[in-house]
Amino acid sequence: MAGKSSGDRRKLLRGAKVGKNAAPAKSIRVGVIDYKDVATLRKFISERGKIRARRITGVSVQEQRLIARAVKNAREMALLPYAGSGR
């Protein structure tokens, strides 16, 4: 058969993301993470209200834990919504 091999497909799938915006937090230096700092926390939340992954934001494991805890506290205090804007 003259089709593409699975190795060729994997290379295509693993390629650079086309059309995506730059990671929002890679240029942000995270200092003190506070649940009351909603403007900073919004940079780590997707449009649907989910906490962005480390591989997207580029923060360390410790910083990701602090961000997740701060986002959850801010949601509990009604500073951030639990769900995003939806459709």
UniProtKB/Swiss-Prot annotation:
Any GO CC annotation of this UniProt entry: cytosolic small ribosomal subunit
Region forming the signal peptide: none
One Pfam family matching this protein: Ribosomal_S18
Gene3D superfamilies in the cross-refs: Ribosomal protein S18
Gene Ontology molecular function, alphabetical: small ribosomal subunit rRNA binding; structural constituent of ribosome
PROSITE patterns referenced in this protein's UniProt entry, alphabetically: RIBOSOMAL_S18
Protein's UniProt keywords contain Repressor: no
Region (Disordered): 1-23
Entry's Gene Ontology BP terms: translation
Keywords noted in UniProt: Ribonucleoprotein, Ribosomal protein, RNA-binding, rRNA-binding
Highest rank taxon of the organism: Bacteria
Biased composition regions of type Basic and acidic residues, renumbered to the chain: 1-10
PANTHER family referenced in this protein's UniProt entry, alphabetically: 30S RIBOSOMAL PROTEIN S18, SMALL RIBOSOMAL SUBUNIT PROTEIN BS18M
Role according to the record: Binds as a heterodimer with protein bS6 to the central domain of the 16S rRNA, where it helps stabilize the platform of the 30S subunit.
Assembly description: Part of the 30S ribosomal subunit. Forms a tight heterodimer with protein bS6.
Protein name according to UniProt: Small ribosomal subunit protein bS18
Organism: Clavibacter sepedonicus (Clavibacter michiganensis subsp. sepedonicus)
